[in-house]
């Protein structure tokens, strides 16, 4: 039996940052209280509690003197207000992608626009998003629920539409198409994070190559359940939280088994499940070697990378960087030197690009990339080779001046 571990399996940078921060506070002997379970992984939460962390349902439950950790899901504005009223110290581990949605929600309220949120109304991330707008808001889980809102949507002067960061990518694309056709006054923001997009895309591809798929992660984890849905469309798929839940008989007859894991799944649990599945992983490749093969390669300024376009706006496009869990941003000025160029004319969703890394940001997991710099490097190389080979090159004259032409 061959076992293939997805490159995107395991902690995303947002979850990793929240977990790392909380462990560091506990190691310093600080009294820590998290608002809700820090992540949707019972094993990690239990370990944190064994080291002294307290899980509280609300700010009212936080003991005096405790330092509050706001989890990556984020919270509504009223929660920040309560923390301030109680004068509690707090550490904000909200995922930057979620923070971006909070700002959009606040803007919707300020501009009198209705806020549409694609997601699970009971999920803490969605509840936090809703808590940042002061205007009318509706949450829908799928196209059918969105269609039921149409009579109300047609009465709105302005609509802002966002998605939970872990929402199903295909479902979001379908909902966006509906909004574009039915609501000309809707401003649609692509807010599914790159880690979610890349994880679902890899699960889609991997599940089509495998006889079985094992999805490791919390049963209450939104992104884990989305991965299970994606994988189950193409092959037999199962969700396990720990190695103890894996029924080895379920694997009987499978030649190739794919393994992926949700954003809240630590590598230790992935290792336990893999070891439970087989003592001979990929021709005796150890878990450490297998994990190393799946881990993202470091990015640095000047590195040339391949990326796929996830979303396009008038001012920038968002890309998924091959071999990385980071998101890439390409500004219009870094896509073309043409002052009249429009981003939607330059690239489309799913286009594959060669880009140069301009700046990395490990804290937020968002990197700045450039197409024009890649073209400049490639152009210089082509010119050098042409000079050496005596090749005649052609180009467009953009401007004539006293010194010649540009």
Identify the residue ranges that each predicted region occupies.
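The feature marks the mature, well-folded catalytic cores of soluble enzymes
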Residues: 1-280
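Single-stranded RNA-binding regions, centering on S1/OB-family and related RNA-binding modules
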Residues: 279-406
């Amino acid at each position: 039996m061959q076992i293939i571990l997805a490159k995107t399996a395991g902690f995303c940078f947002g979850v990793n940052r929240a977990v790392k921060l909380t462990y560091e506070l506990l190691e310093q002997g600080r009294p820590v209280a998290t608002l809700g379970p820090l992540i949707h992984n019972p094993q990690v939460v239990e370990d944190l509690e064994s080291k002294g962390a307290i899980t509280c349902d609300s700010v009212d439950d936080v003991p005096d003197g405790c330092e509050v950790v706001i989890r990556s899901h984020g919270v509504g504005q009223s929660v920040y207000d309560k923390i301030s009223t109680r004068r509690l110290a707090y550490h904000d581990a909200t995922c930057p992608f979620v923070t971006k949605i909070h700002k959009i929600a606040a803007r919707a309220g300020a501009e009198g626009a209705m806020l549409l949120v694609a997601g699970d109304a009971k999920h803490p991330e969605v509840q936090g998003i809703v808590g940042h707008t002061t205007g009318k808001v509706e949450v829908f889980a799928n196209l059918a629920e969105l269609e039921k809102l149409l009579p109300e949507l047609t009465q709105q002067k302005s609509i802002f539409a966002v998605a939970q960061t872990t929402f199903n990518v295909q479902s979001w694309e379908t909902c966006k198409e509906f909004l574009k056709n039915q609501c000309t006054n809707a401003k649609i923001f692509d807010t599914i994070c790159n880690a979610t997009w890349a994880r679902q895309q890899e699960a889609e591809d991997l599940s089509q190559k495998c006889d079985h798929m094992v999805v490791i992660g919390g049963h209450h984890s939104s992104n884990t359940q989305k991965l299970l849905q994606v994988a189950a469309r193409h092959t037999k798929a199962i969700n396990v939280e720990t190695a103890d839940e894996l029924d080895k008989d379920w694997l009987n007859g499978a030649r190739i088994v794919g393994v992926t894991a949700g954003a809240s799944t630590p590598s230790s649990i992935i290792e336990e499940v893999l070891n439970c599945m087989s003592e001979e992983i990929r021709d005796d490749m150890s878990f450490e070697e297998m994990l190393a093969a799946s881990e993202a390669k470091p990015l640095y300024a000047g590195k040339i990378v391949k990326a796929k376009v996830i979303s396009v706006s008038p001012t920038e496009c968002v890309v998924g960087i091959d071999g990385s869990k980071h998101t890439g941003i390409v500004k219009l000025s870094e896509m073309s030197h043409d002052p009249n160029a429009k981003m939607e004319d330059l690239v489309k969703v799913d286009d594959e690009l060669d880009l140069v890394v301009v700046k990395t940001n490990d804290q937020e997991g968002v990197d700045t990339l450039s197409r024009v710099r890649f073209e400049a490097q490639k152009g210089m190389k082509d010119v050098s080779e042409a000079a050496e080979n005596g090749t005649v090159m052609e180009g467009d004259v953009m401007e004539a001046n006293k010194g010649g032409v540009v």
